[in-house]
Amino acid sequence: LVDRRPGEFEGIRLSLLAGDGLLSGMRVFGNPPHTRAFLLFDGETRAMVALMDYGMLNSLRVGATAGVAAKYLAPAGAKTLGLLGSGWQAPPQVFAMVRAVPTLERIKVYSRTPANREAFAKQMATALEMPVEAVGSAQEAIEGADVVDLCAPGHHDVHEPLFERPWIQPGALVVSMSANQSTADFVRNTRVVAASYENIVSEPDAKPPFDELVAKGEFRPEHVTRIGDVITKGANPRQQDSDTVLYHLEGGTVQDLYVATWGYEWAKARGLGKPFDLSL
């Protein structure tokens, strides 16, 4: 369960998360911007058991989710990954996708700052032991790619498409971190996969271009294949190999709890972290 209406007071935003395990969690967003933490609680005693950096936790969760999407939705024999963005979210997504799709042979990356994309390409080429090329435009990164990862976070309140539909190769998988990165024309001509239809249109309101499509009756629940059905029931969003798939990455907030639980158990088993006591 996730409280999708974060509490806000004095510049602080809180989101509560509870799963089916023995732990519950809370995301805390404060000021200055990007001051973010994750609090993990014992499900029975309600005592806090861990305080974590949410930025790192979030990048691991998003990366793992992108990898799962690539494993189940990438076209057969995918060889090229086209990446837009080289920031802190990019490395976990690239590592996860390369592991999930072992046929990948090369990566093309574009980001707005040449020095950043060059440094990222060098770092990833060394870490992955595969060709990683920094290119000069988004179009160059995307064209010919079997898997496209829109890893530039953008601004959630601004519609800023990162690509044009003709750039996308038929049959490709496009992984998007935010709804507002796509055009209405692209969404109309693709197979959409997400956690659920509601995750796309209710955060708290549908973002462009989905708001326009919903208003026109061109985007309805039957247009979305649930990623859970793909994984557990073998649902295939493609009707033919040339169908392009858009995986909408938002809406996996409850996954933070499970990644935090894994991280807590992993660190505790290795004697890592700094113990603290909040009792009076």
Regions found by a protein language model. Name each.
Residues D185-L280:
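Adenosine-phosphate binding glycine-rich loop
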Residues A100-A125:
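NAD(P)-binding Rossmann-fold cofactor-contacting core
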Residues L73-T80, T103-L104, Q169-P170:
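Short helix-loop-beta connector
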Residues L1-S59, T65-G67, A74-G77, T225, ...:
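N-terminal ligand-binding/catalytic initiation module
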Residues Y54-N58, S176-S182, G251-T253:
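Glycine-rich phosphate/pyrophosphate-binding beta-alpha loops
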Residues G85-G87:
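Glycine-rich Rossmann-fold phosphate-binding loop(s) that bind the pyrophosphate
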Residues M130-L213:
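Rossmann-like adenosine-cofactor binding region
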Residues A90-P91:
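N-terminal Rossmann-fold NAD(P) dinucleotide-binding loop
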